[in-house]
Curated annotation (Swiss-Prot):
Any one cellular-component term (Gene Ontology): membrane
Entry's Gene Ontology molecular function annotations: nucleic acid binding; zinc ion binding
Residues in compartment: Extracellular: 87-627
Protein name: Glyco-Gag protein
Region ranges (Disordered): 199-310, 523-627
Xref: PROSITE patterns: ZF_CCHC (PS50158)
Zinc fingers (CCHC-type), renumbered ranges: 593-608
Membrane topology of this protein: Single-pass membrane protein
Length: 627
């Protein structure tokens, strides 16, 4: 076409040949049918817009087109979501850790029941990062296996630098969730086998291998749980024996549901056989399995605090970890207040009857290493020989107070006697180790408080004597020193009246306390003291006001007297001046000058009188009362 004349720069368009030129397609573009091509420059043809103007956005051309596009986009989105959910459906795994986080309110409630506090972030850190490093089988996602929880608790409660006292609340809460599981934990907890009663008459069976425990748990009661142990096979008795007596045989002991300071988390106790115990009925030996307790591992203590059942058989109950934790946190240290901690340990020794291993656990939890060594040393010093005096024989000391685990069977009378003697020596060691070096300044620093009774003050004074001096305040030889300290260090009002007592030397300490109680009880109450102070203040104000008024009246009276004298003096002087002036004035003639006393002119015409301007007349002064 370049060779055609007058066609350079021409634009070719398609002319539609449709019978309906105004009809549009689906997306707004006009349909292109067969046609012919003409030059734009032909003025006889109709001008058509370019195709770009026909193919505009679908949203501006047709509502149906917009509806179709939205439907396509929505279908694609639904298909994508369906594929994503179908791929991930069934892949969510619930772990003990995630389960506890989902029910965190219940976990906090369980911790509160154990008297401990926990934090969510610390909970996740210990479960996923800290406890898996103990190498006891703890998974990173947590577990409710009581055996694994027990091993972690042993690690946490280890004495010395290997222990983790800050993790005690968390492992105690884990153990509580596994021991008494909520409904959302029960599907993840292994079922517990029924507790097995060990009667005193049982034939011996091969012992089961003990659960492996780390060596550092040798001083603690066994914390292994029989949750995963299989029930032992029943041994058929002799067919010639009598049948079982179901009416007279005692049922197995159940766990005490009541709260106790020693069986809070204790597992099901096993009954220890008693030597020489007779059968409860002649038919017991028929169908009752005879067993001997399994051989204990050398690194695991199988002794627990003793408790006697209803049938005279001893059961063992472990110390509750929450009780140990509360005893440690709710009492001062042995160095700060040895008397209070000694009283606590004494009550535990008397009520729980702990074994040698339990005593070591108790000392390791409540005392530091140095305090424990000091207590053990003082206890060994308190061992007495056959003559009743402290002995120095190593054999006698080791027999009475051994440092290594002895072979004392608490099921025998001899073993229980050893344990009783051991507890007595341990208590004596606590009392002797609690005494501080002699410091009389500490004793003199004990003074009676403003509202403290004399009896309470005397108890504090005696406790200071026991703690800071080697003297016993209950000794009659020390009564005089205690009495003098009681008088001098009492409250000022009580001390002054006690010092003025007649025949003070013959008064005993009890007499002084009774006199001090009388003085203390006669003290005015705070209300009476306030009323007395108010009354004294009012009287003092009235007396001061009266004195001020009397002083003011006396001052006014004195001023009036002085003023009267002054006025009388002034008046008398003026009168005398008036009388004297009248007598001294000479008689003038009618032509005599009053100024120069010459005759022939008057005073106004006197040449000797000065003619200058007259000065101001002096003003008379007025006397006031202040002058």
């Amino acid at each position: 076409l370049g060779d055609v004349p007058r066609t350079s720069g021409a634009i070719f368009v398609a002319r539609p040949e449709s019978n309906h030129p105004d009809r549009f397609g689906l997306f707004g573009a006009p349909p292109l049918e067969e046609g012919y091509v003409v030059l734009v420059g032909d003025g006889r043809l109709k001008q058509f817009p370019p195709p770009s103007e026909f193919l505009l956005s679908v949203w501006n051309r047709s509502r149906a087109a917009r509806l179709v596009c939205c439907s396509i986009v929505l279908c694609c989105l639904c298909l994508t979501v369906f594929l994503y959910l179908s791929e991930n459906m069934g892949q969510t795994v619930t772990t003990p850790l995630s389960l506890t986080l989902d029910h965190w309110k219940d976990v906090e409630r369980t911790a509160h029941n154990q008297s401990v506090e926990i934090r969510k972030r610390r909970w996740v850190t210990l479960c996923s990062a800290e406890w898996p490093t103990f190498n006891v089988g703890w998974p990173r996602d947590g577990t409710f296996n009581p055996d694994i929880i027990t091993q972690v608790k042993i690690k946490v409660f280890s004495s010395g630098p290997h222990g983790h006292p800050d993790q005690v609340p968390y492992i105690v809460t884990w153990e509580a969730l596994a021991a008494d599981p909520p409904p959302w934990v029960k599907p993840f907890v292994h079922p517990k086998p029924p507790p097995l009663l060990l009667p005193p008459s049982a034939p011996s069976l091969p012992p089961e291998p003990p659960f492996p425990t780390p060596p550092q748990s040798s001083l603690y009661p066994a914390l292994t749980s029989p949750l995963n142990t299989k029930p032992r096979p029943q041994v058929l008795p002799d067919s010639g024996g009598p049948l079982i007596d179901l009416l007279t045989e005692d049922p197995p002991p159940y766990r005490d549901p009541g709260p106790s300071s020693s069986d809070g988390n204790g597992g099901s106790g096993e009954v220890a056989p008693t030597e020489g115990a007779p059968d409860s009925s002649p038919m017991v030996s028929r169908l009752r399995g005879r067993r001997e307790p399994p051989v204990a591992d050398s690194t695991t203590s199988q002794a627990f605090p003793l408790r006697q059942g209803g049938n005279g058989q001893f059961q063992y109950w472990p110390f509750s970890s929450s009780d140990l934790y509360n005893w440690k946190n709710n009492n001062p240290s042995f160095s700060e207040d040895p008397a209070k901690l000694t009283a606590l340990i004494e009550s535990v020794l008397l009520t729980h009857q702990p074994t040698w291993d339990d005593c070591q656990q108790l000392l390791g939890t409540l005392l530091t290493g140095e305090e424990k060594q000091r207590v053990l040393l003082e206890a060994r010093k308190a061992v007495r020989g056959e003559d009743g005096r402290p002995t120095q024989l190593p054999n006698d000391i080791n027999d009475a107070f051994p440092l290594e685990r002895p072979d004392w069977d608490y099921n025998t009378q001899r073993g229980r006697n050893h344990l009783v003697h051991y507890r007595q020596l341990l208590l004596a060691g606590l009392q002797n180790a609690g005494r501080s070096p002699t410091n009389l300044a500490k004793v003199k620093g004990i003074t009676q408080g403003p509202n403290e009774s004399p009896s309470a003050f005397l108890e504090r004074l005696k406790e200071a004597y026991r703690r800071y001096t080697p003297y016993d305040p209950e000794d009659p030889g020390q009564e005089t020193n205690v009495a003098m300290s009681f008088i001098w260090q009492s409250a000022p009002d009580i001390g002054r009246k006690l010092e003025r007592l007649e025949d003070l030397k013959s008064k005993t300490l009890g007499d002084l306390v009774r006199e001090a109680e009388k003085i203390f009880n006669k003290r005015e109450t705070p209300e009476e003291r306030e009323e007395r102070i108010r009354r004294e203040t009012e009287e003092k104000e009235e007396r001061r006001r009266a004195e001020d008024e009397q002083r003011e009246k006396e001052r006014d009276r004195r001023r009036h007297r002085e003023m009267s004298k002054l006025l009388a003096t002034v008046i008398s002087g003026q009168r005398q001046d008036r009388q004297g002036g009248e007598r001294r004035r000479p008689q003038l003639d009618h032509d005599q000058c009053a100024y120069c006393k010459e005759k022939g002119h008057w005073a106004r015409d006197c040449p000797k009188k000065p003619r200058g301007p007259r000065g101001p007349r002096p003003q008379a002064s007025l006397l006031t009362l202040d002058d």
